[in-house]
Amino acid sequence: MTTRHLYLDTSPPAYTGSRTELDKSAFHKTLPVLAVRVRPEKVGKFLKGDAMKRALLDIPKVRTVVSDPKEEGNRLVLLRMPNEGDIPPEALELIKTESNGLTEFNVNLDYNYWTADEILQSFLPEELREGAPSGFAMVGHIAHLNLNEEYLPYKYIIGQLILEKNNRVRTVVNKINSIDTQFRFFKMELLAGEPDYVVEHHESDCRFMFDFTKVYWNSRLHTEHDRLIQVFQPEEVVADVFAGVGPFAIPAGKKGCGVLANDLNPESYKYLAINAKNNRVDDTVKAFCEDGREFIQKSVSRLWEEPLPAYTGPKQSRVQEEKERRRLQRLKAEGQTVPIPPSEKQHGRRRISHFVMNLPDSAISFLDAFRGLLSGAEPALREQYSTMPMVHCHCFTREVDSRVNAEGDIRKRVEEKLGGALTSETSFHFVRSVAPNKDMYCISFRLPPEVAFGERM
């Protein structure tokens, strides 16, 4: 990659050092330019005047005005050209009338000047430059790579570049092509930086803490997280079957939703509970560590027997809560009547409005757990479900050439596992392409009453 600024080539030099380790001293370049000698009080004329616009040096990270090493108290205004004949006439006229003349000056660029991408393009063998890794996912302080095989011999140098060229990065890891089959998280190797994998990641106005080596997290799904959260209404209850560390559950809780959040991975469950507390939603987001099928089957009766607090409006800040607490203490101390909190006046929430099933590899296989979900329920509980919950099920399909075929494939598999036909209240959302022959979708459907009130599986 070549970066050019009129008359000057600022691209890094051809790398001639070792390829087993990075020789930073090989990255040095001297750019001879002209400089205008001026008194400090006249610098503004040269920087702000129209005459100099096409002549001034405009290289990123290089100052246009420097001290004159030969004339104490004077300044040098650097130009972008090395030859006087290249200076525009209007600029040359200003230089002749308002300066102490021209002088030569060397602009020195070194390893610190160029970006990681520019250094890498110079460092790699020519046949590997096209398609070289140029991006990475950030999770907290961790830069997460997925290097192709041909770049593995240079993985530690790539890691070093990313670490040194990005201030937010403290740890660089590369995904190894194996995945924990039970809990979905990827194995990874440290390329550079600290072996510190407990991150604090911000998404959807929430703060998430987790060990990146022990739980599943995919930053590419933040748009999908936000999309579904917008569907939920604050007064509703959401049952998150495969909640992970809470990318759906915690923002839904902050919105005001009651949430039953479940994950089979003990580490995910641990951080899910921590994140609920850290985001001050642990009163309405309840964490569980169960098999997804078991969680679905228990969810309706669990909420009926242990309702979540009623929605009482937007959550107060810590400062507002503290002011209210002191006000109530003052009323009590003065012997006045202390008002009953709104949450205690209202009945708790006892009906699930949404089930979220974000386990695209196998979520469809859990849908049979909805069979007979409400069979045998007492009349009062059955009345709560005069309108069935919505189910949002993420899945993969190999039907990538046609949206119609993709939706048909997903619908067929869902209906087979549910044991009943879907209603007209069914929609499909394309999430992303994960491979050349594999797309991710979310199917949202109203749970058919004949499934929920039918025989248990």
UniProtKB/Swiss-Prot annotation:
Transmembrane segments: none annotated. Its EC number is 2.1.1.228. It is an enzyme of class 2 (transferase). GO terms for biological process: mitochondrial tRNA methylation; tRNA N1-guanine methylation. S-adenosyl-L-methionine binds at H225, D263, L264, D291, G292, N358. It is found in: Mitochondrion matrix; Nucleus; Cytoplasm. InterPro entries: MeTrfase_TRM5/TYW2, SAM-dependent_MTases_sf, TRM5-TYW2-like_MTfase, TRM5/TYW2-like_N, tRNA_Gua_MeTrfase_euk. GO terms for molecular function: tRNA (guanine(37)-N1)-methyltransferase activity. GO terms for cellular component: mitochondrial matrix; nucleus. It catalyses: guanosine(37) in tRNA + S-adenosyl-L-methionine = N(1)-methylguanosine(37) in tRNA + S-adenosyl-L-homocysteine + H(+). Keywords: Cytoplasm, Methyltransferase, Mitochondrion, Nucleus, S-adenosyl-L-methionine, Transferase, tRNA processing. The keyword Methyltransferase applies. Monomer. Belongs to the class I-like SAM-binding methyltransferase superfamily. TRM5/TYW2 family. Specifically methylates the N1 position of guanosine-37 in various cytoplasmic and mitochondrial tRNAs. Methylation is not dependent on the nature of the nucleoside 5' of the target nucleoside. This is the first step in the biosynthesis of wybutosine (yW), a modified base adjacent to the anticodon of tRNAs and required for accurate decoding. This is tRNA (guanine(37)-N(1))-methyltransferase. It comes from Coprinopsis cinerea (strain Okayama-7 / 130 / ATCC MYA-4618 / FGSC 9003).
